[in-house]
Amino acid sequence: MKFRSDKVKKGIERAPHRALLRACGLSDEDFDKPLIGIANSYIDIIPGHVHLREFVEPIKEEVRKLGGVPIEFNVIGVDDGIAMGHEGMHYSLPSRELIADSIETVVNAHQLDALICIPNCDKIVPGMLMGALRVNVPTVFISGGPMLAGEVNGQKVDLISVFEGIGKVKRGEISEQELKVIEASACPTCGSCSGMFTANSMNCLTEVLGLALPGNGTILAIDPRREILARNAVKALFELLEKDVKPRDIVTEEALDDAFTVDIAMGGSSNTILHLLAIAREAGIEYNLAKINEISKRTPTICKISPASHYHIEDLDRVGGIPTIMKELSKLGLLHTERKTVSGKTIGEIISDAPDADGEVVRTIENPYSKDGGIAILFGNLAPEGAVVKTAGVDPKMLTFKGKAICFDSEEEAIEGILGGKVKPGHVVVIRYEGPKGGPGMREMLSPTSAIMGMGLGDKVALITDGRFSGGTRGACVGHISPEAAAGGPIGIVKDGDEILIDIPNRRIELLISEEEFNERMKNFKPKQKEIKSSWLRRYAKLVTSASKGAILEA
């Protein structure tokens, strides 16, 4: 069998290349084997990645056993929770592009034959997906697995419990000592945080796309089945290599439709919209944001995981995981069940072996949480290119909300205003100049949204922003407002006291001023200019596109 890597290891002209490969431990026999790239993301400062140094060893062992040469390399990672609420969050979304670029660079520079991606958290998963689609060599994903939920006084807790606990301390609901107990209990093991936050949402959707084996998104990091899954994934990769099945053969428009469908049915993180749009672009597919509303209108919400309920990823795994959700959705004909996956099975074959919905963690289609989906795209004069809301996390009485604007031009200003008591019932908190260009980096607004919940305002206050949200955000929070303020978007002309209408059932978001006043303000609007000290972030701000296009870089 001829390999792509023969370009660097075959023929007399490649003697210097082989000399260097010998220095890396390769032998004569290895020059007849495929070079299998392993993109690891081990790092000491992300709980979802601290175990990946050990986790990769049986994967490399399996590659050798099956006749390949494992070539491990690492990519960077940012822990969004640790980067949250300060200038560090400017680097989170941009890190996705660096990860994709790193994979392209290593795989193509060394002409690797196939790729194993080992991500787990937030931007690492989509960054690797983008990179894998870009290089388009046979690829399988093996995520590090989710964290076990914590427990305090018989109640499950997670990272969002800690964020919301800050507001509870401020309003006197709990003491600082009680918060410390929650803090010490919320993250008890390695793994991606235990709710349906961005990391776990993306790991689950990697299954749906067809690039990972069943169980990839839900089997816990500390579960022995995770290693079995990993070894089986390596076996699947060698089948893909033999048949020359590549990521773009698997990630089709139908696969993206199914990913959005499952995402919407399980109330995944709103960040998934941004990432799936970027993934579509790397797959050569122009995906229309408005299409997501069509999917949402026909897709029931049948699963709610923290922060939308008391259930956690371990509960979803217990009842059958993502295949069980897909099995239930297939009863309505919502999925393309003939699609092939890296497992060698079709989606239909995978779900035929899945348990039926238990009726609690995964509800039946006859008894959904709601008849439409857990994510919606809003349009209107405030968001001509669209905005995203995670409806699964919105109090039903807040689905339609009219309130008076209170405006902040940064996340820091907003947090100070919320915790300082400036935000009152009936307000719509407007946080702007936090978009991809304006931030730069489109920071997550988890600290402000958690402060609102912790201050007891979750059913009395809405929040809109051109930034984005953590998967842990809940409440009437509308993000990704496009165009952003820094690009001249209408969110920049909102004034304190203006009335804003958020109408989720009708997918509308409107600034309630006259058309004449609106046009006059837009005519006179000059976006604020920020000084960006970082040369990397300056380049990012210059090249990044709108959130409505996935916030990808375009030269």
UniProtKB/Swiss-Prot annotation:
* Residue sites binding Mg(2+) per the record: 80, 122-123, 444
For this protein, the record's PROSITE patterns field holds: ILVD_EDD_1, ILVD_EDD_2
The GO cellular component terms are: cytosol
> What processes in GO biological process is this protein linked to?
isoleucine biosynthetic process; L-valine biosynthetic process
Binding site residues for [2Fe-2S] cluster = 121, 193
EC number assigned by the record:
4.2.1.9
Residues annotated as the enzyme's active site: 470 (proton acceptor)
Give the cofactor note.
Binds 1 [2Fe-2S] cluster per subunit. This cluster acts as a Lewis acid cofactor.
Return one GO MF term: hydro-lyase activity
Coiled coil segments of this chain: none
Q: In which pathway does it act?
A: Amino-acid biosynthesis; L-isoleucine biosynthesis; L-isoleucine from 2-oxobutanoate: step 3/4; Amino-acid biosynthesis; L-valine biosynthesis; L-valine from pyruvate: step 3/4
Give the N6-carboxylysine positions (modified residues).
123
Reactions performed catalytically: (2R)-2,3-dihydroxy-3-methylbutanoate = 3-methyl-2-oxobutanoate + H2O; (2R,3R)-2,3-dihydroxy-3-methylpentanoate = (S)-3-methyl-2-oxopentanoate + H2O
What keywords sit in the KW lines?
2Fe-2S, Amino-acid biosynthesis, Branched-chain amino acid biosynthesis, Iron, Iron-sulfur, Lyase, Magnesium, Metal-binding
Pfam families, from UniProt? ILV_EDD_C, ILVD_EDD_N
Q: Which cofactor does it need?
A: [2Fe-2S] cluster; Mg(2+)
Matching PANTHER family: D-XYLONATE DEHYDRATASE, D-XYLONATE DEHYDRATASE YAGF-RELATED
Q: Identify its protein family.
A: Belongs to the IlvD/Edd family.
Q: According to its UniProt entry, what is the function of this protein?
A: Functions in the biosynthesis of branched-chain amino acids. Catalyzes the dehydration of (2R,3R)-2,3-dihydroxy-3-methylpentanoate (2,3-dihydroxy-3-methylvalerate) into 2-oxo-3-methylpentanoate (2-oxo-3-methylvalerate) and of (2R)-2,3-dihydroxy-3-methylbutanoate (2,3-dihydroxyisovalerate) into 2-oxo-3-methylbutanoate (2-oxoisovalerate), the penultimate precursor to L-isoleucine and L-valine, respectively.
Record note on quaternary structure: Homodimer.
Name of this protein: Dihydroxy-acid dehydratase
Q: Which organism is it from?
A: Aquifex aeolicus (strain VF5)
